[in-house]
Amino acid sequence: MRILRGSPALSEFRVNKLLTACREQQLPVTGIYAEFMHFADLKAELNPQELEKLEKLLTYGPTIQEHEPQGLLLLVTPRPGTISPWSSKATDIAHNCGLHGIKRLERGTAYYVEAETALTAAQIATLEALLHDRMMEVVFAELTDAQQLFSVAEPAPMSQVDVLAGGRRALEEANVSLGLALAEDEIDYLVESFTKLGRNPNDIELMMFAQANSEHCRHKIFNADWTIDGVKQDKSLFKMIKNTFEQTPDYVLSAYKDNAAVMTGSTVGRFFPDPESRQYTYHHEDAHILMKVETHNHPTAISPWPGASTGSGGEIRDEGATGIGGKPKAGLVGFTTSNLRIPGFEQPWESDFGKPSRIVNALDIMLEGPLGGAAFNNEFGRPNLLGYFRTYEEKVTSHAGEEVRGYHKPIMIAGGMGNIRAEHIQKKEIPVGAKLIVLGGPAMNIGLGGGAASSMASGQSAEDLDFASVQRENPEMERRCQEVIDRCWQLGDKNPIAFIHDVGAGGISNALPELVNDGDRGGKFQLRNVPNDEPGMSPLEIWCNESQERYVLAVAAEDMPLFDAICQRERAPYAVVGEATEERHLTLEDSHFANTPIDMPMDILLGKPPKMHREASTLKVSSPALERSGIELNEAVDRVLRLPAVAEKTFLITIGDRSVTGLVARDQMVGPWQVPVANCAVTAASFDSYHGEAMSMGERTPVALLDFGASARLAVGEAITNIAATDIGELKRIKLSANWMSPAGHPGEDAGLYEAVKAVGEELCPALGITIPVGKDSMSMKTKWQENGEQKEVTSPLSLIITAFARVEDIRKTVTPQLRTDLGETSLILIDLGNGQNRLGATALAQVYKQLGDKPADVDNAAQLKGFFDAVQTLVRNDKLVAYHDKGDGGLLVTLAEMAFAGHCGIKANIETLGDDALAALFNEELGAVVQVKNDELNAVLATLAAHGLEACAHVIGEVEASDRLLITCGEEVLIERSRTELRTIWAEMTHKMQALRDNSACADQEFAAKQDNRDPGLNAKLTYDVQADVAAPYIAKGVRPKMAILREQGVNSHVEMAAAFDRAGFDAVDVHMSDILTGQTVLDAYQGLVACGGFSYGDVLGAGEGWAKSILFNAQAREQFEQFFQRKDTFSLGVCNGCQMLSNLRDLIPGAELWPRFVRNESDRFEARFSLVEVQKSPSLFFSEMAGSRMPIAVSHGEGRVEVRDAQHLAAIEQSGTVAIRFVDNFGQPTQAYPSNPNGSPNAITGLTTQDGRVTIMMPHPERVFRTVANSWHPDNWGENGAWMRMFQNARKYFG
């Protein structure tokens, strides 16, 4: 083993955060210095040239002042016996650079700790807990201890459970020790089954059975028979859900039988490379819509980042594994937790009811979990466009006195939508002899028993089992697997995939049997063929672990050469682990121990284990009405605006890429001031049409504490009012995912669950004509623990989270909450579907005064809700609405405030027609919406509402004004007169506090200050050219299309939209993978243009873009090709984002690029996804010809975009050379260092450069994602089909003549 020191690992502000954490733990630590340590496991000693190459390879990241280490060494490394994702990617890069003497690279972090006094063993243990993640890392005291990273353990054997001699008792003991969560009748079933087979079960067989038959996988409660209050019910919960499909099967193409549901989409030109020529082209066909929403609650409670990350990853795999290959497109995440209690910002309603030590508190869940979910989506390359966040934790009256209801076991929702070809919706037959394949990453000893663990209430399984059941993420691997799936479905009827499932709960022990069972086959498997990064694992651990980023497939033997070629090109690992058999029998052979760990008929595993029967009793609790004597109106406004369910959530949004794919038409951020208040998410179905897809969410979980049915109905209703202002058409076009969370078995909750499912499945949805073709349930929403000898528990309310999905006819019609003051006189109309009842039970108002109230809002009239949707659709289609915002948490007051924030304007409202109870009128959460309409169309709008039966509930309540005030009166009485800026500041406090705790606090402070600037003119565009003119048109007309290499490396994710932009500009865009160049299949001589695309090549291991660049620089064949290409005078090149970082590292090969800087970690120390204003500079860049002086917004999505120069002279030389191509500017048009206008902190606001001759340009922002006007988060009204950035690509075509 060779040890190589790396660069410092922590920025100054990260060190300060760590020192603060030490102080909070009363540790006498005075200083911490951390640096990366690299460990190389060698086949043979490296020669001097190889060593120099390796040292260069391991020099990456921002330049931070190095120290000579001193103090106590704590070396944090991955767990011995595991191979980290960093290791596998860094080793790949080393091999691609020709360093074949390296067996493996691994990385650790060496912390050198100085203290006032020598640390005790207990203090060191406390410090270690701050420095490492005990689930995947260890702490060593010496650098040489890292040798253990490369030691190979001997495989552990399996064990048996002696049922034949020990009977039921032996299995009961195994049930506890292995954490199987088997029910009593399942234990009986297994004892009987193995007694009949005349042999003892192996531990691996029991774990496999437990996973496959866990509540998590089998949904026993939803399939159970029910007796309620002594009356036998004639339908199961699942049957009531399926009733929605029986009543309204319209537009549903697949339901209840696959990894995701499928609905009818649009006929459009799908843009992807031709499988033969690899040239990108449009394929006119149906792009049907797939949809899925998952939960990952248990792992997120234990370890929030990996819990939420693998939750998103698993849901993405569900979409990819639909039919025989789907394409994930856009994602959502949601969180419900107990109270945040932000230090120094604790709110009056936030009591502390304690928690068990093994789960994370709500604050840490929300500081870490969202980053995990965002990071996976970002690296995979899926925009995250939707979400919600609610907190609830309160003592409420129950049938047995008082109890604490809340979310110590959080809800973590991960969902999304994608597209699928018509001929791929149904899975094919699995031929006998078909190869059974595991595609993706290796097995690791993580996530053991996840399915069974998440089926238990938190606290029922031993703490080490809880930690064993959390998985680890590697999104770049999942991206590679999806590229394989994409190449397969793009082959159309030649798609080699016969059957595919994702690997989720229970690992391959669940996925492989499910695969062959669903194909009506058996399987013969070889355990030692399973790719395995931990040789010491037992057969149970290899078979049942939940290592992520894996799929199982059946591929006919004759299709294997094609499948193999695809995997080789995409560098996606796979292994043939078995063959499909005619006989429905499961055999697993272990060549190492020469035995058969599994040998059982399929029917024992997946036959008919005993069906559950639930007995339930209805328990209704009366709750007192809201006590209002202590409520002052203006204080109520402030409290409600600070409640997390209401407050601004920017800290959850800008961490997630919202522009990747170039198909995003509506993200969370609305208008020129980018305020996060969008009602729903909208995507374009293709680059060549205005058809699209929309998704929205609805949830009102606290209402279930008063009325189970009302809570469920409101969730459906809110999802509808959120999505209503997109151009959908008829209501039955909307399809729902229903995610049910319940503390099953808690007194009254089972009957409540039945009531809620019946309310939606048997009553409301059939009445609306809406189908629920997909969903998920989590039935163990309770946390129990002992504290000072006292038994404590926190129980979640019944929680239904609804996600609505719909096809969109015209994405340009979507109406946002942004109020406009530049369209003449306008009025505001409230459409009140509560019909003046103004019920205050379980509202935000009640919560912030630590109350529940009595009567909640409800959907009393399904026909009226349908009339509302139809009316809004008519108004949207006829362009009658200026702005639209649904009424939700916080009521009318919050709806009006958020519309004013989005429009940066004032509101004058009079609520006298809403009854004589102003508090109830302003804070009730009955369904409805506020719309802004032009006064000359007011009567027509009111007539449309009346025609749909809404005359009595439509109230003209006010007008919009160009001011900084929110004025609400009741007749002559002034109720509220506040500065909009002041309210906007209160609304932003939570997001500021969370950002300051999590990110660079100086950046958080700057952003908070910027929101308080009432003079801010917002985003704007000032162009020096005609956006409608196409300067490439004359050259396109000649019929000559120059060839453009759309270059990607593993982990790149922005290549398709890049190809679409160049295709539109008149180029033949060709898909070129780095593996094509390294294997000599492609030569760059054939191309006139080259573009290096954005994403996360090698998962940003060895620095963003640096690993990709070094695999070129240190590979003789690749280096020669690129060098020759750059030397040719008839070529041009572009690098965007990751491609910009990569090309900047090739500066030695590019003429005129000598002064280019490096691009390193953002100032905020966070991935930044913004819609930022830039100005084009005067430069030689051919891309920006005649664009100098233009100012317009552009998509920014990166974690490492800060320009780093050697010194002030280097920066001055760059400026003097005239090669700066674009700069960030503030909304006043001035180059800026201020965050977030300058989202990465680059000096002189530089974010794009070119060469002296202008033929090569690099830039961090993404013009390819916003080349269409509809893909811009905000744009001027007068732009046509092409957005301002299309000119860049047209200029490139013009350059070739």
UniProtKB/Swiss-Prot annotation:
Keywords: ATP-binding, Cytoplasm, Glutamine amidotransferase, Ligase, Magnesium, Metal-binding, Nucleotide-binding, Purine biosynthesis. Signal peptide: none annotated. GO terms for molecular function: ATP binding; metal ion binding; phosphoribosylformylglycinamidine synthase activity. Gene3D superfamilies: 3.40.50.880, Phosphoribosylformylglycinamidine synthase, linker domain, PurM-like C-terminal domain, PurM-like, N-terminal domain. The keyword Cytoplasm applies. Pathway: Purine metabolism; IMP biosynthesis via de novo pathway; 5-amino-1-(5-phospho-D-ribosyl)imidazole from N(2)-formyl-N(1)-(5-phospho-D-ribosyl)glycinamide: step 1/2. GO terms for biological process: 'de novo' IMP biosynthetic process; purine nucleotide biosynthetic process. It is found in: Cytoplasm. Its main location: cytoplasm. Mg(2+) binds at E718, N722, D886. Its EC number is 6.3.5.3. SMART domains: GATase_5. Residues 1044-1297 form the Glutamine amidotransferase type-1 domain. ATP binds at G307, A308, S309, T310, G311, S312, G313, G314, E315, I316, R317, D318, A678. CDD domains: GATase1_FGAR_AT (cd01740), PurL_repeat1 (cd02203). Pfam families: AIRS_C (PF02769), FGAR-AT_linker (PF18072), FGAR-AT_N (PF18076), FGAR-AT_PurM_N-like (PF22689), GATase_5 (PF13507). The keyword Ligase applies. It catalyses: N(2)-formyl-N(1)-(5-phospho-beta-D-ribosyl)glycinamide + L-glutamine + ATP + H2O = 2-formamido-N(1)-(5-O-phospho-beta-D-ribosyl)acetamidine + L-glutamate + ADP + phosphate + H(+). Phosphoribosylformylglycinamidine synthase involved in the purines biosynthetic pathway. Catalyzes the ATP-dependent conversion of formylglycinamide ribonucleotide (FGAR) and glutamine to yield formylglycinamidine ribonucleotide (FGAM) and glutamate. PANTHER family: PHOSPHORIBOSYLFORMYLGLYCINAMIDINE SYNTHASE (PTHR10099:SF1). Monomer. NCBIfam families: FGAM_synt, PRK05297.1. In the N-terminal section; belongs to the FGAMS family. This is Phosphoribosylformylglycinamidine synthase. It comes from Vibrio cholerae serotype O1 (strain ATCC 39315 / El Tor Inaba N16961). The gene is purL.
